[in-house]
Amino acid sequence: MSSIEWRVSEGLTDYEYARSEMTKRVADIANQEASEMLWFLQHPPLYTAGSSADRRELLMPDRFPVYPAERGGRYTYHGPGQRIGYLMMDIRKHGNDIRRFVHSIEKWVIESLAEFGVTAYSHPERIGIWVDTPDGEAKIGAIGIRVRRWISFHGFSLNICPDLEHFSGIIPCGISEFGVTSLHALGKKVSMSDVDQALADRFPYFLEALQSKEAF
């Protein structure tokens, strides 16, 4: 863990700046000129379009800035009250299995949520982190990873206390039949730093899972 830099940015981080920083860091890691990094931050309100985004799923194109993202997936929302975790890691050093890497991120976030009494789960047909609510299944976290020269970038988002109405400008991840929720909406009034600590506590288990040979 000591070889992986942890960076936590206060306030709101411009998306274009974050993308530029990730691109540079990925190149530096690939060239063995920088350490791996986990970057926790928040963005101002915006939508991002993954490589599979369908323009028809952008319901309010003028509501917030829309940025193309180099990750997989479709449209998603980022904004204040949402913890973004960008992972710039050399997958060759951590199991050399991209599929396992993605599923291990899901497991890491799910186990971190359990520390707040939230039972979350992944779904075999819908990527992301899900919970059951009185209104049915709802998404509380999203996963979107890109890999370049075996170095990961982008990562996950976890809804702590964002304005959930902001998701109405898109069909999140192309899934219209399920809603979105947050820790606060579930009655868990935790802070951003509480969530960061839970993720840090579970991070060694995430690294162990990357090396596991167990099937998903």
UniProtKB/Swiss-Prot annotation:
Q: Which InterPro entries match?
A: aa-tRNA-synth_II/BPL/LPL (IPR045864), BPL_LPL_catalytic (IPR004143), Octanoyltransferase (IPR000544), Octanoyltransferase_CS (IPR020605)
User: By its UniProt entry, which SUPFAM superfamilies does this protein fall under?
Assistant: Class II aaRS and biotin synthetases (SSF55681)
Q: Which residues are listed for substrate binding in this entry?
A: 71-78, 142-144, 155-157
Sorted alphabetically, which keywords does the UniProt record give? Answer: Acyltransferase, Cytoplasm, Transferase
Gene Ontology molecular function: lipoyl(octanoyl) transferase activity
Write out the catalytic residues in the record.
173 (acyl-thioester intermediate)
- Catalysed reaction(s)? octanoyl-[ACP] + L-lysyl-[protein] = N(6)-octanoyl-L-lysyl-[protein] + holo-[ACP] + H(+)
Additional comment = In the reaction, the free carboxyl group of octanoic acid is attached via an amide linkage to the epsilon-amino group of a specific lysine residue of lipoyl domains of lipoate-dependent enzymes.
The UniProt function text for this chain reads: Catalyzes the transfer of endogenously produced octanoic acid from octanoyl-acyl-carrier-protein onto the lipoyl domains of lipoate-dependent enzymes. Lipoyl-ACP can also act as a substrate although octanoyl-ACP is likely to be the physiological substrate.
Q: Which HAMAP family match?
A: LipB (MF_00013)
Return the protein name: Octanoyltransferase
Q: Report the source organism.
A: Zymomonas mobilis subsp. mobilis (strain ATCC 31821 / ZM4 / CP4)
Gene responsible for this protein? lipB
